[in-house]
Amino acid sequence: MILKAAVENDLAREVLTAHTYTTSATEQHPEGITISNWFLRRIEDKDTKGTVVCAKTGFVAQSGNCAASYEETDSGKHYICVTANAHSSWRCIYDHVAVYQEYTK
């Protein structure tokens, strides 16, 4: 539900769909801060039966490497995939690829 709401918010969608995003300038960071979405860069060449347009990753001790991604298919269907407890950050990518390959129509 959080990712669905984020996709519907213009600023959140802009940040989550960008491979790199630079924040607005502040006194501490006059050039802004550049954020890189490694999930999008790593999944873009994988066969997911659609296009993963945005994603957010994270890590906490209780649930390990986690990721949420949003995919759009050529037929216009939209899918959200959420995974947790991957043993590595790369494994998050392959978990999402496997889920999209299995369930995307």
State where each predicted segment sits.
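Penicillin-recognizing serine hydrolase domain
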Residues: 1-105
